[in-house]
């Protein structure tokens, strides 16, 4: 678990990653969902899908605090941001990622 980098030299990098996360999950992907006919359009769905993918199972078994992006370790947050960018660019299959996420959740 990250300690939120309070007072750390990593704090600016962490803040940048969190801002990227919020932009991609709250704005970029929901806007694209309208034009691409994706199975989800809500920000929390994109957050679930991306975090589940980087953990390889349900993320909520690993992250104690909420909101999750504030408590995910830096490496996984960076991986989730990168995956979100790949989804936005059409380089990762959101349908498949969502299906896997739902399967991990018993859906």
What are these regions (language model features)?
Residues 1-107:
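Positively charged, phosphate-engaging catalytic surfaces used for nucleic-acid and nucleotide handling
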């Amino acid at each position: 678990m990250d300690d939120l980098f309070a007072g750390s030299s990593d704090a600016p990098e962490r803040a940048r990653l969190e801002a990227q996360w919020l932009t991609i999950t709250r704005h970029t992907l929901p806007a694209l969902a309208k034009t691409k006919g994706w199975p989800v359009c809500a920000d929390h769905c994109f957050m679930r899908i991306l975090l589940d993918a980087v953990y390889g199972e349900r993320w909520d078994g690993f992250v104690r605090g909420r909101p999750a992006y504030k408590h995910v370790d830096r490496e996984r947050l960076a991986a989730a941001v990168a995956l979100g960018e790949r989804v936005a660019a059409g380089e990762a299959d959101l349908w498949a990622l969502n299906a896997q996420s739902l399967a991990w959740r018993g859906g």
